[in-house]
Amino acid sequence: MACRPRSPPRHQSRCDGDASPPSPARWSLGRKRRADGRRWRPEDAEEAEHRGAERRPESFTTPEGPKPRSRCSDWASAVEEDEMRTRVNKEMARYKRKLLINDFGRERKSSSGSSDSKESMSTVPADFETDESVLMRRQKQINYGKNTIAYDRYIKEVPRHLRQPGIHPKTPNKFKKYSRRSWDQQIKLWKVALHFWDPPAEEGCDLQEIHPVDLESAESSSEPQTSSQDDFDVYSGTPTKVRHMDSQVEDEFDLEACLTEPLRDFSAMS
């Protein structure tokens, strides 16, 4: 049986006859082509992605959301914000349920005790903060204060059942209505009080002693009071490094003793 001679490659014959480019390889035949029939290039994909990003609207809607939501360029911060919003809403519902249970128990104790008397459910108090943006901002400030070595040492050395009001620092209640100035002051005093549990300074480190601050006055009022202002007068500096300023001068200059002291002969000493 005679073997049939193989024909020369197609692209070789074309190259010999004319200057047309060779046919593409088999693996490149499945590539996507543009609308005009040309092949895709890497720079074409980047241009298309850039044009698609420019055409994206600034906001979008979802079936679950009642209003449009703005797009976020940083996905990590968006996820963190959503987790914090979910946590704040859960804590707010738990705190509201706790208030209702406590008020319901007080009403039952103060009622006449008759079976036909109907007790009305207590409503949420007027000083209850329900603004989600305010609660999230306060939660961020609390998280910033708790993410410290001093707070870790504090919760380890002083368990919750051993903490005494007025002696140990208490986290400000973010669900109570406070002015922005009053809340920031409470957070600052709370952070200053936590510095009492800072790790001990190493030898050779010139750090001054940190004294605890009483937070009872700042936490019980919605506006800044004189006692809180006195604390600020005594303590000055940033929350990370607070120094105790002594108002009295230890060594006072005595003018009379200086005048009566005999003059020294500095030339003889030299």
Curated annotation (Swiss-Prot):
Protein location: Cytoplasm; Nucleus
Modified residues (Phosphothreonine): T61, T62, T171
A GO molecular-function descriptor: identical protein binding
Entry annotated with the keyword Nucleus: yes
Residues recorded as bearing Phosphoserine in the entry: S20, S23, S59, S182
GO BP term, pick one: mRNA transport
Reported tissue expression: Widely expressed.
Record note on what altering S59A does: Does not increase its stability at the end of the S phase and through G2 and mitosis
Region (RNA-binding): 129-198
Domain of life where this protein originates: Eukaryota
Keywords on record: Cytoplasm, Isopeptide bond, mRNA processing, Nucleus, Phosphoprotein, Ribonucleoprotein, RNA-binding, Ubl conjugation
Disordered: annotated segments: 1-132, 215-241
Presence of keyword rRNA processing: no
Motif (Nuclear localization signal NLS2): 96-99
Modification note: Phosphorylated on Thr-61 and Thr-62 in the S-phase. Phosphorylation of Thr-62 by CDK1 primes phosphorylation of Thr-61 by CK2. Phosphorylation of Thr-62 is required for its degradation by the proteasome at the end of the S phase. Its degradation is not required for histone mRNA degradation at the end of the S phase. All the phosphorylated forms detected are present in the cytoplasm. Both unphosphorylated and phosphorylated forms bind the stem-loop structure of histone mRNAs. Phosphorylation at Thr-171 increases affinity for histone mRNAs.
Motif (Nuclear localization signal NLS1): 31-34
TM annotation in the entry: none
Start-end of Low complexity biased regions: 218-228
Cross-link (Glycyl lysine isopeptide (Lys-Gly) (interchain with G-Cter in SUMO2)): K98
Principal subcellular localization: cytoplasm
Biased composition (Basic and acidic residues): 37-58, 84-94
Entry function: RNA-binding protein involved in the histone pre-mRNA processing. Binds the stem-loop structure of replication-dependent histone pre-mRNAs and contributes to efficient 3'-end processing by stabilizing the complex between histone pre-mRNA and U7 small nuclear ribonucleoprotein (snRNP), via the histone downstream element (HDE). Plays an important role in targeting mature histone mRNA from the nucleus to the cytoplasm and to the translation machinery. Stabilizes mature histone mRNA and could be involved in cell-cycle regulation of histone gene expression.
Domain comment (free text): Amino acids 31-34, 96-99 and 241-244 are necessary for interaction with the Importin alpha/Importin beta receptor. The first 18 amino acids, amino acids 69-76 and 179-182 are necessary for interaction with TNPO3. Amino acids 31-34, 96-99 and 241-244 are necessary for nuclear localization.
Protein name (Swiss-Prot/TrEMBL): Histone RNA hairpin-binding protein
Source species taxonomy: Eukaryota, Metazoa, Chordata, Craniata, Vertebrata
